[in-house]
Regions:
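Extracellular, repeat-based ectodomains that mediate carbohydrate processing or recognition
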Residues: 1-221
Length: 221
């Protein structure tokens, strides 16, 4: 999105594939200091304190967004550790209402394109609560044939790489599998989401050393 848009992750629904007309709704807001856009402070405007992961669709009425972010929509964001979260929602519903979400949890504060609008995010389920000793990178998501969401991410401890981890969340928002190390050497592909096929999650990526590309898989129980 451009600098003049709301600071948020936005979900768009294509209404007409022929001309790509779509309806867009903000689903997860970013904090910026009040008046940052008026001051034309592009550093503050573009510092989202978040990173997009991906969206997976389990059914026509059940989809999930996975990303990382700081928890607060206030100046606390400057000092908070970014955590992994999921929002499971009905893509056809009004995402500005709590009834659109399967998962529960709200966060409120100041957002908008200038940091001066009161905003509330719904359905935010935090999947991690790491201290600043740990950091998360490349959050990703795919969905199984059973409709369970497999969340993958890279974890670091004091900037030292620990590996790829997986969390499984069912369609109702329950954690079916807590964070489990999948590989100590694999990295995730930041350019493409993993895919699910024949009981496994598949992705291509690198290892800790070298430039070769490898095919990785993780058997989902």
């Amino acid at each position: 999105e451009g600098d003049c848009y709301d600071r948020a992750f936005t979900v768009s629904e294509v209404k007409n594939a022929g001309n790509w007309n779509c309806d867009s709704q903000n689903i997860f807001s970013f904090w910026i200091s009040k008046g940052a856009f008026d001051r034309y402070d592009m550093y503050e405007v573009n510092e989202n304190f978040a990173r997009m992961g991906g969206i997976a669709v389990g059914s026509e009425q059940n989809a999930a967004l996975v990303a990382r972010s700081v928890p607060s929509l206030s100046s606390k964001a400057k000092n908070e550790n970014q955590q992994l979260f999921i929002q499971i929602f009905n893509p056809s519903a009004d995402l500005n209402t709590p009834g659109a979400y399967v998962t529960s949890g709200t966060r409120s504060g100041l957002g908008g394109n200038n940091g001066d609008e009161q905003v509330t995010d719904y359905g935010v389920k935090w999947l991690t609560n790491y201290s600043k000793t740990y950091s998360i990178d490349n959050p990703q998501v795919t969905v199984t044939d059973a409709g369970n969401y497999v969340v993958l991410f890279e974890r670091y401890k004091k900037y030292n790489y620990q590996g790829v981890y997986a969390i499984v969340v069912d369609a109702k928002g329950n954690v079916a599998q807590k964070a489990t190390k999948v590989s100590a050497t694999a990295y995730l592909n930041p350019c493409r989401m993993p895919v699910y096929s024949n009981g496994k999650v598949w992705w291509t990526g690198n290892k800790t050393k070298g430039k070769d590309t490898y095919l990785f898989s993780y058997a989902v129980k």
